[in-house]
Amino acid sequence: QSIPNSAPLEYIKNLFDNYAFQFDAHLQNILLYKTPELLREQLNPFLENKKYKLLDLGCGTGLSGQCFSDIAKKIIGMDISRNMLNKAKEKACYDILIEKDILSGIPELAENFDLVLCIDTLVYFGNLNDFFEKIIVCLQVNGLLAFSVELANEAATSYLLQTNGRYQHAETYIKELAEKKPLKLLRYASVIGRQQDNEAIQTGLFIFKKI
């Protein structure tokens, strides 16, 4: 039986509409979530002395926006969950918030960006080819793409669907997909992004530059 390309959109929307009200506290206090901060550490050496036009895909409640707002002249956040976006609005670090799933929302954007973030969002997508295809269009030449995935075991060659509904991706799968696009890998790191049921979740952090 083949693995679905992604989680159903209605499932994602309902999950996070219901999760939004305790999301920040649960992630930070229970799951010890720190992926935005870890990705920022990896990205810092490649940042220029300028303010970026930033697109935050799957922005959720805005934890990532908070972590990167100091380097942004403009931040657009996109998420499928209205309740999550309402929480992001309270953080007052976004210029525009868009209620849309990312794959259909990216092509509707009327501008390009020099920094695109996608943190803890690709866990709801298995096949990432469409994601890369759409990102290339909205990313400026020399623009940066920074994202996270949950890492699959070393035996995996592409992606796995876990029983919790989240996907894991193989490091080699990501790199091979990107090699077919005008993207140069600047940094890859394997880190502990959060805890789940007392287990450390191996997270892959990727930073690419459009060439």
Locations of the language-model features?
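A short glycine-rich, Lys/Arg-flanked "PGG" loop and its adjoining helix->strand segment in the class I
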Residues: 129-144
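Short, glycine-/aromatic-enriched active-site segment of Class I SAM-dependent methyltransferases
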Residues: 147-167
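Class I SAM-dependent methyltransferase SAM/SAH-binding core
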Residues: 55, 59-105
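Short alpha-helix
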Residues: 166-181, 188
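Core SAM-dependent methyltransferase catalytic element
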Residues: 193-211
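N-terminal auxiliary segments of SAM/dcSAM-dependent transferases
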Residues: 1-13
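Conserved SAM-binding loop and adjacent beta-strand
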Residues: 25-41
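A conserved beta-strand element that flanks and buttresses the S-adenosyl-L-methionine
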Residues: 117-118
